Design a protein with these regions (language model features):
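Glycine-aromatic micro-motifs
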Residues: 1-171
Length: 171
């Protein structure tokens, strides 16, 4: 089964389970030499940045669920592209599929979308720098700041389904 690295709305366990019912979260991971950015359509992408890391969630996705994931990310319309990239998970480095948005920003995040991503990032207890970056995107989108959830396992975040995906870095 392919590994998939999620850094946006697919970090949400409940939403990902609806889209890809056989997928299993493997834990937190990071994509080195990239930085979160907002594309023109208002969704996240991972843009190349030698000084940055994008933190997210590594999933084990069944082949039977890949079509649904590609449809959700609007791969056929060209909103996103996907590529195999090395990611560093809790159990070491792995090759994983990563979706990159085709329209590199700058943009302003869609408010409901970024609120859901921020909730999922907090639930997964992603690093403070990642939370701060997402909070800055949320503030720019006019999303009110909320307190992080109390301990425990990652919970589901609000049901958010972006109409578009993330911008692809075309260097």
């Amino acid at each position: 089964m392919p590994l998939y690295f999620a850094y946006g709305s697919n970090m949400d366990v409940e939403g990902m389970t609806r889209r890809c019912p056989r997928a299993k979260p493997l834990g937190r991971a990071r994509l080195a030499r990239h930085q979160l950015a907002i594309m023109r359509e208002g969704w996240l992408t991972a843009a190349r940045d030698v000084r940055g890391d994008v933190h997210g969630v590594l999933w084990d996705v069944a082949f039977a669920d890949m079509r649904a994931l590609d449809q959700y990310e609007q791969l056929a319309s060209g909103l996103y592209t996907k590529a195999q990239q090395p990611v560093i998970g809790e159990r070491g480095a792995k090759q994983a599929l990563v979706y990159f948005g085709a329209n590199a920003g700058p943009g302003v995040a869609a408010a409901d979308y970024i609120a859901g991503v921020l909730a999922a990032a907090r639930n997964w207890k992603l690093p403070a720098a990642t939370i701060a970056r997402l909070e800055s995107f949320a503030a720019a989108a006019g999303v009110a700041r909320s307190a992080p959830p109390a301990g425990g396992e990652p919970a589901s975040s609000p049901r958010v389904r972006p109409r578009f995906a993330t911008p692809f870095d075309r260097d």
